[in-house]
A protein has these predicted regions:
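Secretory-pathway ectodomains
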Residues: 1-281
Length: 281
């Protein structure tokens, strides 16, 4: 039996330390981390997305499952039961991201814009929240369109940032407890942006890439928004209009603005890394 200690995993360009052991009987197999799951590189079989002391959580395109380390499935949740969407007839919803465990429930976000909580012991549905218009008149609790969802470790609540809406979902109350349009809250700051992309939760802030109202569909700006104070606290024009006109260089959604310590990092479409030193904001 092979025992391998997993010490560092790279995920979303951030280093996460995990002090867990992965045990597998075949000593010839190699494991690596990809797409939020442990993967056997020879069979492409997914192992565990979340590893606890005596069980793991994993998912495929069709099911989310809880299993112990003796290959016993404790429960399975069929993703087909979440329903389809009028925008993609015939397609089944899939998990976009497993967010975390809070108050005895496991939360995940789906491709069709749904936020779902399952009872960790039974796999039963505890809460279903949706911003998908297809879910009106259904068992989903409707809210404004959910965007990028983040699990906040400090209070185990979930933060959603969409194109213009900010929401907090209280995982204990199982309810949306805060919701506002940040363009309306800060019209002279973040309200000057036509669109924002790739928000990243960073403590009391979220970072973003943005297109100003006067721009023409290309991303040149980055910014930091204080979601508690509800105001833009910093912005910067990374790519000038002149540079874009000459080189067509721009920022792209797959390369968000990262904050690490007092440094900010963002890459442009030409793979240039821009580094900023963050002062008090």
């Amino acid at each position: 039996m092979k025992t391998g200690k997993i010490e560092v995993i790279i995920h979303n360009a951030q280093i996460v330390s995990i002090n867990k052991y992965l045990i597998y009987e075949d000593t010839n197999n190699v494991f690596h981390y990809r797409n939020n799951n442990f993967v056997d590189v020879f069979s492409s079989k997914y192992f565990f997305n979340i590893v606890e002391d005596n069980y793991g959580i994993t998912y495929t395109k069709t099911h989310l499952s809880k299993a112990n380390f003796q290959d016993e499935i404790l429960w399975q949740f069929p993703l087909s039961s979440l329903g389809g969407t009028e925008y993609e007839p015939g397609k089944t919803d899939k998990i976009d991201k497993i967010l975390g465990i809070a108050h005895g429930n496991i939360w995940f976000y789906t491709d069709f814009g749904r936020l779902v909580a399952l009872d960790l012991e039974t796999g039963d549905v505890v809460k279903k929240i949706s911003g998908n218009p297809s879910d009106k008149n259904s068992t989903y609790e409707m809210t404004l369109g959910l965007g990028d969802c983040f699990f906040r470790p400090l209070d185990k609540n979930i933060v959603s940032v969409s194109g213009f809406d900010f929401q907090i979902i209280d995982t204990e109350q199982l309810a949306v407890t805060e919701q506002y349009d940040f363009r309306e809250a800060d019209p002279m700051g973040i309200g000057t942006y036509r669109s924002i992309y790739s928000p990243m939760l960073q403590g009391d802030y979220f970072t973003f890439l943005g297109i100003k109202e006067e721009d023409f569909g290309y991303i040149r700006w980055i910014g930091i928004f204080d979601y508690k104070a509800r105001k833009l606290v910093w912005e910067y024009e990374v790519i000038s209009e002149e540079e874009f006109d000459e080189t067509r260089n721009q920022l792209v959604p797959p390369q968000p603005l990262y904050m690490s310590g007092n440094k900010l990092y963002v890459k442009d479409i030409k793979d240039n890394l821009h580094i900023f030193e963050r002062e008090d904001i």
